[in-house]
Amino acid sequence: RGRTMIDGYGRTIEYMRISITDRCNLRCRYCMPDGVDLVSMSDLLSFEEIEEICCVAAELGIKKIKITGGEPLVRRGCTALIGRIKQIPGIEEVTLTTNGVLLAQQMSELCENGLDAVNISLDTLSRCNYEEITGKDKLEYVLEGIQAAVEAGIRVKINSVLQKELNDAEWGQLIGLAKDQPIDVRFIE
C-alpha cells in the first residue's frame, strides 16, 4: 500500500479499464462489423487472473475499475466478477461499459454485486437508425436497461457516437434523456 502510479504528465493514475471479452451481441458498423476475427476463449484472461491483476492494481493506488468489452455482459459470470472486484481492499468503485441490451435482464445481479455506475453506448433513439447502426433491432432492450439502472439507483452515463447524416439530427433527443432523469450524456466523435 501507499505506492502510486504516475503518468507522463505527472497525474496520479487511479482507474483501470479491463476488457473481459471481445465478443458482442451487436454489430455496430464503426466498431465490430460482421466477419471480425474473435479471440479464442482460452486466450482470454480468466476471472481469477483478472481478480489478481485488480489486487496488484489496488496496491499501486488504483481505486476504480471499469469493466468493458466487446460487450461484457455476454461473458458468463460477469456480474459475479464485479462482486469479486468490489471486495478487493482499496477498490472504491466498479463501473460497466455496455451496449445495454442485456442490462435490464441482469440488473438485479449487478446491484447485488455492488455495481456503482454504468456507461451505456447509445447512438440514436430512432429504432430504424439503431438497427442501421448496430445491425440489430434491440433499441427497446437498451431503453429498458437504462430505466432499470435509473430505478436501481445506479449512476448512468450515455456515450453517443455522432455520425454525420445518420444521427447528427438527434442530439437534442439524446440530451432529452437527461432532462428529467439522473443521466449524463456524452457525445463522442
Model-identified regions with their sequence ranges:
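Canonical Radical SAM [4Fe-4S] cluster-binding loop centered on the CxxxCxxC motif
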Residues: 8-47, 60
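Radical SAM/AdoMet-radical enzyme domain recognition
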Residues: 47-66, 74-178, 184-186
